[in-house]
Amino acid sequence: MIDVELPNLMQVRAFIRVAELGSVSRATEVLFRAQSVVTRAIAELEARFAVPLFERHANGMRLTDYGECLLPRAQRVLAELDGVPSLLGTAQGEPLYLFQARRLQVFVKLCETRHMQTVARHFGLSQPAVSAALKVLEGGCGQPLFVRTSRGLQPTVASRDILFPIRRALNELRLLDSDLSAMQGTLRGVVHVGALPLGRSRILPDAILRFTAQHPQVRVVTNESPFDLLATELRVGDVDFVLGALRPHDYASDLVGEPLINEEMVVLARRGHPLLHTHLTLKGVHQARWVLPRAGSPARQLLDNCFAAAGLTAPWPVVESADLAVIRGLLVRSDMLAAVSAHQLAYEIASGELQRLPLALPGTARAIGLMQRSGCLQSPAAVALMACIRQVITEQA
């Protein structure tokens, strides 16, 4: 079941048109609705948010501070939905068949589960109600969105084309309440953080502790998926931002990185390792039993390049892993070596359980920072958590 009822999209649409045109009467001309219907939509939306969105004047409607706060994100919701017809190659115009939040949620969940009964249970609906919602969407789109097969519902190309903007629209819609709460002086809601290995061991926990102490009504959810999956979640708004090793500028034009700190990789070994107090060279450790990042990962490529610059072939790993618990367990129980960022195992290094070998790995420096979707409008809570991350990094530097 869904706990929080999203704002009514038709009411949000009416709010935007009245705000843009300055009066209910002018808005009715573009909404093709009776004045009483538009007036009621505004009143119900104000009741939903429990704040006045407009000041009523004899010559029209003027946004209150609350209305000004909500308008930018509300416009982003409609912009995402208004762009769907062009993705489908259909006639332009307002796609009113999309202006029902539960219908959009059903579509997204069907794309995820590909099973109508599962979606019905999730939303507390009957299966015929789910079928009816899908029928309305397919009628508006003018083409099938799913094909029924022995393996369940399979999304069509059209479904895949419109899924991202619909997910973004729903995520923007969810943030309207958070925007309003922030304006009233209290941060509420949920911040979804993509946590890559270089940021999640020390930087992110310290920042979350600081943030939740300051804003106890905000919940933080971390996502530890691989970067490519996090990038997709970032693009659709399911993740607010990603903390970790930044990718090159040419990785994707729609993602923006903010470097906060640079750090070279180090070679770690257990306490008392026989190589700790010897003069080491890359050639001398080339044949060691290595625990290395996975082949093809940015960290592994940097490490391979480091050895290549010294005229050596890439070291052959006994184990490939990015899991810190696995790496730690292997190192403390053997004479294996691991090449990682010091941030990743900072507590083990500080306690002396793991120790750095006196060996530099030139050319392996990586920028650690924040990555966001280009042009996104972050929630106030996400902005505050990113500020805490910047503070923590500044203090730890």
Swiss-Prot record:
Annotated ranges, domain HTH lysR-type: 7-64, 99-156
GO molecular function: DNA binding; DNA-binding transcription factor activity
Record Pfam families: HTH_1 (PF00126), LysR_substrate (PF03466)
Similarity annotation: Belongs to the LysR transcriptional regulatory family.
Top-rank taxon: Bacteria
The protein's name in its UniProt record: HTH-type transcriptional regulator GalR
InterPro entries cross-referenced by the UniProt entry: HTH-type_LysR_regulators (IPR050950), LysR_subst-bd (IPR005119), Tscrpt_reg_HTH_LysR (IPR000847), WH-like_DNA-bd_sf (IPR036388), WH_DNA-bd_sf (IPR036390)
SUPFAM superfamilies per UniProt: Periplasmic binding protein-like II (SSF53850), Winged helix' DNA-binding domain (SSF46785)
GO biological process: catabolic process
PROSITE patterns: HTH_LYSR (PS50931)
